[in-house]
């Protein structure tokens, strides 16, 4: 069986470690955008009531038409601007990487940063380039970042905002400079 796995699974995938989430017991967990409190009973009841009318035996609308309309209205998004919906950021990160993946293309992000950027780049067969944040305050070292963009010519740049795991927000002027210098897509996650 080991020989079969070695033959079938790419070496770069075999070398990956599972994405480990430590037990949060006794900690204040701020990194996963989770509500540390339960939903109020009134909100739970309202949510469950809304489930009565759903066709749970059918796949949902793949375009999320109603969700897109609500987002456009709430956020003032023009109708000619596309929206891409997904089942959490991991799926969207993966969809974008797969969409641009070709031999030799690169994903660039900041380190330390969200571990899924590196992992999904590997899944998609892309090279990952991590650019270190400043060690004193975890801010973007803009000259180093711009040099990496020029040298590596990434197809995709991910910027977690606020950064995960450091929690800091990056200087908006630095982010604009990165977007202007990028030869490919820049995703602010």
Swiss-Prot record:
<dbReference type="InterPro" id="IPR015421">
    <property type="entry name" value="PyrdxlP-dep_Trfase_major"/>
</dbReference>
<comment type="subunit">
    <text>Homodimer.</text>
</comment>
<protein>
    <recommendedName>
        <fullName>Histidinol-phosphate aminotransferase</fullName>
        <ecNumber>2.6.1.9</ecNumber>
    </recommendedName>
</protein>
<dbReference type="InterPro" id="IPR015424">
    <property type="entry name" value="PyrdxlP-dep_Trfase"/>
</dbReference>
<dbReference type="GO" id="GO:0030170">
    <property type="term" value="F:pyridoxal phosphate binding"/>
</dbReference>
<comment type="similarity">
    <text>Belongs to the class-II pyridoxal-phosphate-dependent aminotransferase family. Histidinol-phosphate aminotransferase subfamily.</text>
</comment>
<dbReference type="GO" id="GO:0000105">
    <property type="term" value="P:L-histidine biosynthetic process"/>
</dbReference>
<keyword id="KW-0808">Transferase</keyword>
<dbReference type="InterPro" id="IPR015422">
    <property type="entry name" value="PyrdxlP-dep_Trfase_small"/>
</dbReference>
<keyword id="KW-0663">Pyridoxal phosphate</keyword>
<keyword id="KW-0368">Histidine biosynthesis</keyword>
<dbReference type="Pfam" id="PF00155">
    <property type="entry name" value="Aminotran_1_2"/>
</dbReference>
<comment type="pathway">
    <text>Amino-acid biosynthesis; L-histidine biosynthesis; L-histidine from 5-phospho-alpha-D-ribose 1-diphosphate: step 7/9.</text>
</comment>
<dbReference type="GO" id="GO:0004400">
    <property type="term" value="F:histidinol-phosphate transaminase activity"/>
</dbReference>
<keyword id="KW-0032">Aminotransferase</keyword>
<dbReference type="InterPro" id="IPR004839">
    <property type="entry name" value="Aminotransferase_I/II_large"/>
</dbReference>
<keyword id="KW-0028">Amino-acid biosynthesis</keyword>
């Amino acid at each position: 069986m080991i020989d079969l796995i070695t033959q079938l699974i790419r070496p770069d995938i075999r070398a990956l470690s599972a994405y480990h989430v430590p037990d949060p017991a006794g900690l204040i967990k701020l990194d996963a955008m989770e509500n540390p409190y339960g939903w109020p009973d009134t909100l739970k009841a309202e949510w469950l009531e809304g489930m009565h009318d759903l066709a749970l035996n059918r796949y949902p609308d793949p375009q999320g038409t109603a969700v897109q309309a609500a987002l456009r209205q709430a956020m003032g998004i023009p109708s000619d601007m596309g929206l891409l919906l997904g089942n959490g950021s991991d799926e969207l990160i993966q969809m974008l990487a797969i969409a641009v993946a070709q031999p030799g293309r690169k994903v660039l992000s900041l380190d330390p940063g969200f571990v899924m950027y590196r992992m999904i780049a590997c899944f998609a067969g892309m090279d990952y380039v991590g650019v270190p944040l400043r060690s004193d305050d975890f801010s973007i070292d803009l000259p180093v970042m711009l040099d990496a963009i020029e040298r590596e010519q990434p197809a995709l740049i991910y910027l977690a905002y606020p950064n995960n795991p450091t929690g800091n927000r990056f200087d908006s002027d630095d982010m604009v400079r990165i977007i202007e210098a990028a030869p490919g897509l820049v995703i602010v996650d």
